[in-house]
Amino acid sequence: MPRTLIAGNWKMNGLMANLAEVERVAAEVPASSEGAETLLCLPATLIHAGSAKSEGSGLKIGGETCHANEKGAHTGDLAAEMLKDAGASYVIVGHSERRADHGETDAVVAAQASAALRAGITPIICVGETLDQRDAGEVLTVITTQMAESIPEGAEAAAIVIAYEPVWAIGTGRVATSEQIAEVHTSIRNLLVRRFGDAGRTTRILYGGSMNPGNAAEILAVAEVNGGLIGGASLKAADFLAIYRLAAQ
């Protein structure tokens, strides 16, 4: 079974003062931990300082997006190599908010993931359906297409992470049922095995829809759930650590 990954996504939140939360998490995650792997994906302005705060601990730091190109005339964008240089070892690509706000297509997401792999950092590739797509019975069709087109050619199964984020459950307080999560995660696992063979069983699949300390134990017990991509509950160390401890049991 893949090692559990508990990943936080701060989104567009956090100033330098909020790095105290990073320090609190780092203090509770030993470098020698064999339990769940722990990651905080921070705004670009906090990655370097966050990496310094977590040094010597088991807490890893990541970015929230990257550009598909390695450098050039792309004002305001960040290359994956820049994130790595600042201390990131992971990067989220294809989050539904990026897809909606910035028009990032599956092809763009694949290019971003490829750029991350070239830079030596792990892409967390997000997939998920909208409420309209779920109500129309299109969930598995949407997931199958996103999986086929968002994972770059040449990627190795163990070098990527998949995050299933039902768009209708992000930041809404609504959470997919255990049955709904199991159906999609099992489908994703089958798609990974179809693409990568037995190596597809090594790819971690995270759930990313309003996970919090109150529901984490139930979600983490679902088949083929290898961790969480956590939004609001990652902003406070106490909440994030509560989920980490549940995963580490």
UniProtKB/Swiss-Prot annotation:
Its main location: cytoplasm. It comes from the Bacteria. Its EC number is 5.3.1.1. The active site is at residues 95, 165. One of its GO terms (biological process) is glycolytic process. Substrate binds at residues 9-11, 171, 210, 231-232. PANTHER family: TRIOSEPHOSPHATE ISOMERASE (PTHR21139:SF42). Involved in the gluconeogenesis. Catalyzes stereospecifically the conversion of dihydroxyacetone phosphate (DHAP) to D-glyceraldehyde-3-phosphate (G3P). Homodimer. NCBIfam families: tim. This is Triosephosphate isomerase. It comes from Hyphomonas neptunium (strain ATCC 15444).
